[in-house]
């Protein structure tokens, strides 16, 4: 898969492409990452890439001419590429979107700066706008790296161990379980005995319960519309009975009953 990043700061990307899983994917020929400087497509002595917005207001807007030329130049080489703009109005990026893009065509990523891009570019040359969250960044470069990293991890061969991607958070709409490594006891805190038992069936059950618990506590929205396995349904039903018992105890003895009985 080829990524072409259109940016005013191309020197940000060699470091991204030169480390970890991304570097390995590049070296194996699984992906190629090219950063094009939008300024190289600007005209005039100063190669101006931004201007004041019509109608007034704060900030500057990326000019349409250099951005259009940059996109078209990238499309000449990667004719079937999908043009993705990293911007705040876009669809919220998630694992499902990463998987969809990983199974698709090459991607041209447009990194916004200032107040954004001219709407005429968005309306005619952008295939999809993506946001990585409800917060403000200085530009689309870091967002582009987030999106590329998530996509590259899903390309076959990038991780080395294909099961790694399947077991990570969000891959099955659950947050990942807790992890422990040596030593078994650290500053008085012990590793759960079951993880040291060697019983892989019980370990899998423990991990399933932990994933469900973390998801229910921190991201219950991920569970909406999810198809649960029989094992997961049993776990949730058991929790439901335990919660009902707690509620009955409080109803009989008052809200302080639990603290008094400890």
From Swiss-Prot:
CDD domains per UniProt: TrmD-like (cd18080)
InterPro entries attached to this UniProt entry: Alpha/beta_knot_MTases, tRNA_m1G_MeTrfase_C_sf, tRNA_m1G_MeTrfase_TrmD, tRNA_m1G_MTases_N, tRNA_MeTrfase_TRMD/TRM10
A GO MF term: tRNA (guanine(37)-N1)-methyltransferase activity
EC number: 2.1.1.228
Catalysed reactions, semicolon-separated: guanosine(37) in tRNA + S-adenosyl-L-methionine = N(1)-methylguanosine(37) in tRNA + S-adenosyl-L-homocysteine + H(+)
Cellular component annotations (GO), alphabetically ordered: cytosol
Leading EC class: transferase
Subcellular location: Cytoplasm
Swiss-Prot/TrEMBL keywords: Cytoplasm, Methyltransferase, S-adenosyl-L-methionine, Transferase, tRNA processing
PANTHER family linked to this entry: TRNA (GUANINE-N(1)-)-METHYLTRANSFERASE (PTHR46417:SF1)
Assembly: Homodimer.
Main function: Specifically methylates guanosine-37 in various tRNAs.
NCBIfam families per record: PRK00026.1, trmD
Name assigned to this protein: tRNA (guanine-N(1)-)-methyltransferase
């Amino acid at each position: 898969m080829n990524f072409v990043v259109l940016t005013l700061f191309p020197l940000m990307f060699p470091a991204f492409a030169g480390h970890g899983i991304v570097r390995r994917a590049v070296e194996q020929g699984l992906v190629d990452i090219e950063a094009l400087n939008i300024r190289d497509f600007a005209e005039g002595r100063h190669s101006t890439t931004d201007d004041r917005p019509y109608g007034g207001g704060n900030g500057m807007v990326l000019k349409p001419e250099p951005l259009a030329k940059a996109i078209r130049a990238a499309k000449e080489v990667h004719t079937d590429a999908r043009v993705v703009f990293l911007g705040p109005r876009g669809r919220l990026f998630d694992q499902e979107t990463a998987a969809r893009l990983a199974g698709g065509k090459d991607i041209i990523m447009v990194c916004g700066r200032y107040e954004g891009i001219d709407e005429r570019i968005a309306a005619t040359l952008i295939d999809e706008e993506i946001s990585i969250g409800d917060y403000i960044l200085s530009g689309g470069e870091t967002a582009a790296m987030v999106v590329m990293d998530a996509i590259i991890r899903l390309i076959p061969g990038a991780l080395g161990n294909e099961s790694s991607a399947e077991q990570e958070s969000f891959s099955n709409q659950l947050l990942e379980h807790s992890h422990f490594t040596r030593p078994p006891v650290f500053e008085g805190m012990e590793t759960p005995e079951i993880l040291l038992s060697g019983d892989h069936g019980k370990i899998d059950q423990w991990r399933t319960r932990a994933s469900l618990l973390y998801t229910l506590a921190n991201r219950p929205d991920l569970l909406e519309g999810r198809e649960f396995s029989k094992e997961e349904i049993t776990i949730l039903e058991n929790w439901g009975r335990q919660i009902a018992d707690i509620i009955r105890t409080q109803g009989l003895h008052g809200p302080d009953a639990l603290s008094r009985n400890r």
